């Protein structure tokens, strides 16, 4: 056999091997609620809402959401066989914003740090955009994820919100922590002018360990809505209640979400949580 023929045969074997690996990977690609999960990309899923979560969401006269929807963004290299932290995004109720809408704001900084981003919603609108409505749909979204990836129940979870969403993030985090259904590893609260997290700790009593959860307050130096003074008061309130890891960071800007602050906060959560 000539050297040329031998090279062709070896090269051909390498090509066949590469093709086989590609086909093998394609056959084992992760899916969620019928959607293919591509690392570094985002998907939108639909999922059934169980009676349990419908009962929660429909309080205060809201309709019963039978189907939920969620936007998820995944970091490069994502593989559900490994553990990944999840950033749960909660939006304000102003301007008819939904958490699924706000998820895109956090996508770039969060996925760059190796986090999954989750924003949940329904396929119908509520009569009142209540905390119970948000809780029911978030719970149903987590249930849908855990149905296909049971191991995700043990993944660390942080809550993030801007303005009104930051207040509600604290409430939802305390409620879910009280139920023992999530492993809370941090709160990123931006543009916040009232301490709902501390109040929720006292109301829902998730346990003393909750006071060890790191809290990052992100304040715009020229914010006319959630002023620097308001952020200082929120920090003081949290520390007075007993939160031990409260960090207030200020940036040049107004009432806005600063992407670089999101990234720094997620790095801090990882450092303290050692995950």
Per-segment meaning from a language model:
Residues 86, 92-140:
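Active-site machinery of serine-nucleophile hydrolases
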Residues 90-94, 146, 162, 169, ...:
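Cell-envelope and extracellular/periplasmic
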Residues 186, 191-262:
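The feature captures the conserved acid-bearing segment of alpha/beta-hydrolase catalytic domains
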Residues 76-83, 129-164, 177-178:
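Gly/Ser-rich "nucleophile elbow"/oxyanion-hole loop immediately N-terminal to the catalytic nucleophile
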Residues 12-23:
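Bacterial N-terminal signal peptides
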Residues 155-209:
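Primarily recognizes the serine-hydrolase "nucleophile elbow" in alpha/beta-hydrolase
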Residues 262-275:
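Catalytic active-site module of serine/aspartate enzymes centered on a nucleophile-bearing elbow/loop
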